[in-house]
Amino acid sequence: MALKDLFERDVQELEREGILFTTLEKLVAWGRSNSLWPATFGLACCAIEMMASTDARNDLARFGSEVFRASPRQADVMIVAGRLSKKMAPVMRRVWEQMPDPKWVISMGACASSGGMFNNYAIVQNVDSVVPVDVYVPGCPPRPEALIYAVMQLQKKVRGQAYNERGERLPPVAAWKRTRG
């Protein structure tokens, strides 16, 4: 019997006894995915739905997003909720740069994702032209359940790591789930 087979048999026996085996990277990714702290960056009507996601009915805290952070230095996730004006874009970029690595961005609503329903010269047409976006949440405004689903999608992405082996960011995910009857 090969050494590898003996080791696998021993691991299986220890797992039956309740001992957990994992890599350090998986453990850190699990911890990060279950403690995502969002930065407050509500810009318009979507911010109201973002706040509603923390109420008793929706309870975003059960996914580890306990408290919205006012300081970017304490946040992991920036939720861009609403339209982004061209004057506000450099400020948002600066806030994103102040967030510690690893950091993620959720683009919430039609205005943040594509500029909104109207082509307005003062509005940035895509938030991903200012900061890299990891998850898009469609809707005008999206319901709190859609934001919670986006956080769940981001958790999956964080567990699988948001970067590949060369250090490049993985492509964004569209968080779409039917939230109404």
Curated annotation (Swiss-Prot):
InterPro entries in alphabetical order: NADH_UbQ_OxRdtase-like_20kDa, NADH_UQ_OxRdtase_20Kd_su
Keyword Transit peptide: no
Domain of life according to the entry: Bacteria
Catalytic activity: a quinone + NADH + 5 H(+)(in) = a quinol + NAD(+) + 4 H(+)(out)
SUPFAM superfamilies per the UniProt record, alphabetical: HydA/Nqo6-like
Catalytic activity, EC: 7.1.1.-
Keywords on record: 4Fe-4S, Cell membrane, Iron, Iron-sulfur, Membrane, Metal-binding, NAD, Quinone, Translocase
GO cellular component, one term: respiratory chain complex I
Cofactors, names only: [4Fe-4S] cluster
Disulfide bonds: none
Enzyme class: translocase
Subunit record text: NDH-1 is composed of 15 different subunits, Nqo1 to Nqo15. The complex has a L-shaped structure, with the hydrophobic arm (subunits Nqo7, Nqo8 and Nqo10 to Nqo14) embedded in the membrane and the hydrophilic peripheral arm (subunits Nqo1 to Nqo6, Nqo9 and Nqo15) protruding into the bacterial cytoplasm. The hydrophilic domain contains all the redox centers. This subunit interacts extensively with Nqo4.
Chain's role: NDH-1 shuttles electrons from NADH, via FMN and iron-sulfur (Fe-S) centers, to quinones in the respiratory chain. The immediate electron acceptor for the enzyme in this species is menaquinone. Couples the redox reaction to proton translocation (for every two electrons transferred, four hydrogen ions are translocated across the cytoplasmic membrane), and thus conserves the redox energy in a proton gradient required for the synthesis of ATP.
This protein's name: NADH-quinone oxidoreductase subunit 6
